[in-house]
Amino acid sequence: MASITRQAYAEMFGPTVGDRLRLADTALVIEIEKDHTIYGEEVKFGGGKVIRDGMGQSQRMAADCADTVITNAVIIDHWGIVKADIAIKNGLIAGIGKAGNPDMQPGVTIVIGPGTEIIAGEGMIVTAGGIDTHIHFICPQQIDEALTSGVTTMIGGGTGPATGTFATTVTPGPWHMERMLQAVDGYPMNIGLLGKGNASQAAPLREQIAAGAIGLKLHEDWGSTPAAIDCCLGVADETDTQVAIHTDTLNEGGFVEATVAAFKGRTIHTYHTEGAGGGHAPDIIKVCGEANVLPSSTNPTRPYTVNTLDEHLDMLMVCHHLDASIAEDIAFAESRIRRETIAAEDVLHDLGAFSMISSDSQAMGRVGEVVLRTWQTAHKMKVQRGSLPGDNARHDNFRVKRYVAKYTINPARTHGIAHVVGSVEVGKLADLVLWRPAFFGVKPSLILKGGSIASAAMGDPNASIPTPQPVHYRPMFAGQGSGVAAASLTFVSQAAQQAGVADRYGLRKRTVAVENCRSVSKRDMVHNDWQPDISVDPETYQVVADGQLLTCEPATELPMAQRYFLF
């Protein structure tokens, strides 16, 4: 039998079972768990290669073939780290397996035909498009920035650079909801908007859900009182929508116990649950142990570094309209920034108690760094805490699955969109991101929206080949013309979908209703479902979880940083 060295095989067809990859310049290493391709029957495109007429390409009609095949890719997702060919059909993931010509090859599960396009995935990593659930829609340019970082779904609120939007992720009222849904209709990004949840009467909240909001946002700047919390969650239960909350930093309406009591066991997504981004000082972090609380972080505290505290004070003054000349405003800012709880947040992520990571875009967060800071946190914890149970000296597969879930499947489940996005699984929208391993988490090579390429690192358009400098991100065809509407989704409430808001507003994108928002709980947070009993010392701010002190040192140096951004 003919043989080939492992190195030569990896160079030709990409890594296979037992091969390992380093992620960017981190300390994280993955090992391929399974290879769905067949040795000796791999497909590859190019001169003298396999995918040619009568060889790896069949004669079958387009209806029986994939529209696009990504060949020999390494998939990283919450369910596994595998090598496979990926089929895309009608904008959806149609297969994960072995591609080729079933008339010539054994074991083919994905048919390549004359109507099939090929994307070479050899040596590449494929992940699901990221989901950022904490967006202040302050400027539309955020969408391009997020897309080129590997994010394909944005959830939040706002109306542009209005004072309310600078501070809160809220698109308030039916009129603003209609205008914003119309505005985002032209962008290659899946988008869902949150209405204002701060009201003590239900009617103003119901009308926002009916207008298209996929959920409601409670924010302390609008008054996150127990009465508002109770009312908002009641409307959410009626309409099967999610509630996100930024709790009461100053403890004016009650302490954290009063807020938890107002939840009444109902599901809620707690933003920046550590507290630097806002929330009951100093112990909002305790809520991550509640079964009905779905806790997330925003990325400025990810991970804890020697610069974290200083930059937060300046950010806070701007984002929450505070005045440095007013002593009470300074005290408010300083009460939110605590090194002890930020350090504990790192550890709680590594142990799976914090379930999600998001941005807080332009409002104490960086919209293009959700993916990057997730992996920086994973690296820091690997270096400081060693391997997790389930991992070993060869690989960090479990830790990688835990962290990728924080910006893919878990936010999708939280906001009722996991039936269409959030993972690399058959039947879901083909929102896929391709990475060279050396640039993983930092700079993707291709971003697919609904099976079409929406953005890519592209060279000089006037060059004779695609690679000459300057190479930078450029919009591709899925972000142009009518292709935008075909490749992306607008998420709305079930009530809005039934009322036909898409036609009423003149939307071109397909609208999809959120579902199962009220039945989701902490136990549904994949690899991130730990519910510790947490206490915070009111004087030292030390965090103890199930009797264990949680702390770590700030990082003085991180991977995925300067060496990737010289130009």
Curated annotation (Swiss-Prot):
Catalysis: reaction(s): urea + 2 H2O + H(+) = hydrogencarbonate + 2 NH4(+)
Gene3D superfamilies to which the protein is assigned, alphabetical: Metal-dependent hydrolases, Urease, subunit C, domain 1
Cellular compartments annotated: Cytoplasm
GO cellular component, one term: cytoplasm
InterPro entries listed in its UniProt record: Amidohydro-rel, Metal-dep_hydrolase_composite, Metal_Hydrolase, Urease_alpha_N_dom, Urease_alpha_subunit, Urease_AS, Urease_asu, Urease_asu_c
Domain Urease residues, every copy: 129-567
Residues the record lists as N6-carboxylysine modifications: K217
A molecular-function term among this protein's GO annotations: urease activity
Residues holding substrate: H219
Pfam family, one: Amidohydro_1
Cofactor(s) essential for the protein: Ni cation
Family that this chain belongs to: Belongs to the metallo-dependent hydrolases superfamily. Urease alpha subunit family.
Name of the protein described by the UniProt record: Urease subunit alpha
Species: Delftia acidovorans (strain DSM 14801 / SPH-1)
Gene: ureC
